[in-house]
Design a protein with these regions (language model features):
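Sec-dependent bacterial lipoprotein signal peptides
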Residues: 1-29
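Short, intrinsically disordered low-complexity segments
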Residues: 8-14, 32, 133, 163, ...
Length: 237
């Protein structure tokens, strides 16, 4: 039986009067399980990325062509990150190359597919929608290290630190951890995702946990989190 533990919580906004209380509120960290993998979440203020254990011998065989539209399995139905596998690689995981698609614009249709192929240093990700749009990128296997390709190219005024992405394998699963630090006017925050990939029932099972933290000038602090799991059917290439 596939399982995942949802950590979805109602939005919390904490208004605190003293700096000491604020530090206490922001220093909390937690541990969750994402598709049976233990994930430790450091305080977002520490700047420490979420990095899981990694062993290349534990990498799964993900080779195959899958439908871009999946079947919801469990967790938060309102989460849209996994509605389309190509868009998940592009927007949630910020995978370099996926955004280089030339016209026509990508359309999420039942005919759209995403193919994964093991190559030296990671996986090649190829997407096509059956109507002319296509893109190809590489997801590196870094054994827990940070992806250098995710830094300078993704930095801008609102995200001065760019994107920090780590990848690795554990428990027969591929994991990808992405951290986006942002600043806007008097506010700042962090968006973190941990995605777990593994073969399941002839297809591809993807589980993702999202944690979003932000702080403003009042001072106020908010946190939102969710977990969702979606299965993508394999199709003939």
């Amino acid at each position: 039986m596939n399982s995942t533990i949802s950590v979805k919580r109602p939005r919390r906004v904490l208004r605190v009067a003293g700096a000491g209380v604020l530090v206490t509120a922001l220093s909390a960290c937690g541990v969750s399980r994402v598709d049976e993998v233990s994930v430790k979440w450091p305080s977002f203020k520490s700047g420490t990325p979420v990095v899981l254990p990694s062993d290349p011998a534990q990498c799964p065989d993900l080779t195959g062509t899958y439908r871009a539209q999946g079947e919801f399995r469990s967790g938060d139905r309102e989460t849209t990150a996994l509605n389309d596998l190509r868009n998940f690689f592009l927007y949630t995981l910020d995978l370099p190359g996926m955004r280089d698609t030339l016209l026509p614009e990508w359309r999420s249709t039942p005919e759209a597919t995403v193919a994964l192929a093991r190559v030296e240093g990671g996986w090649r990700v190829s997407a096509q929608d059956g109507q002319g749009a296509r893109s190809t990128a590489q997801l590196p296997m870094l054994n827990g290290a940070q992806d250098p390709a995710a830094l300078s190219g993704d930095a801008n005024a609102n995200r001065p630190d760019g994107v920090r992405r780590h990848t690795g394998c554990t428990q027969g699963r591929l994991w990808v951890s992405v951290r986006n630090d942002w600043r806007q006017y008097e506010s700042m925050g962090v968006m973190r995702h941990v995605a777990i990939f593994r073969p399941d029932a002839g297809g591809l099972l993807v589980t993702v946990q999202r944690e979003s933290d932000s702080i403003g000038m009042l001072p106020w602090y908010s946190n939102e989190g969710s977990v969702s799991q979606v299965w993508f059917a394999r199709v003939a290439p």
